[in-house]
């Protein structure tokens, strides 16, 4: 599957840990470099 910030197509994104602790597929968003997988409400690790 495609990781965060990698090019995505046909919903091939990896899952991403959400703030509620559930794993959900990343959203495929169109950006300046084409469509990329993006975690929505990704848990930030410092």
Curated annotation (Swiss-Prot):
Post-translational modification: Contains 4 disulfide bonds.
Distribution of this protein across tissues and organs: Expressed by the venom gland.
GO cellular component: extracellular region
Keyword entries, A-Z: Disulfide bond, Neurotoxin, Secreted, Toxin
Subcellular location: Secreted
Domain of life: Eukaryota
Single GO MF annotation: toxin activity
Broad class of where this protein is predominantly found: secreted
Main function: Potent toxin that may paralyze and/or kill insect pests such as H.virescens (lepidoptera), S.exigua (beet armyworm) and M.sexta (tobacco hornworm).
Protein name (database record): U2-plectoxin-Pt1a
């Amino acid at each position: 599957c495609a990781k965060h910030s990698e090019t995505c197509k046909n919903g091939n994104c990896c899952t991403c840990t959400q703030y509620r602790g559930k794993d959900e597929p990343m959203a495929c968003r169109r950006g300046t470099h084409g469509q990329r997988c993006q975690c929505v409400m990704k848990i930030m690790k410092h």
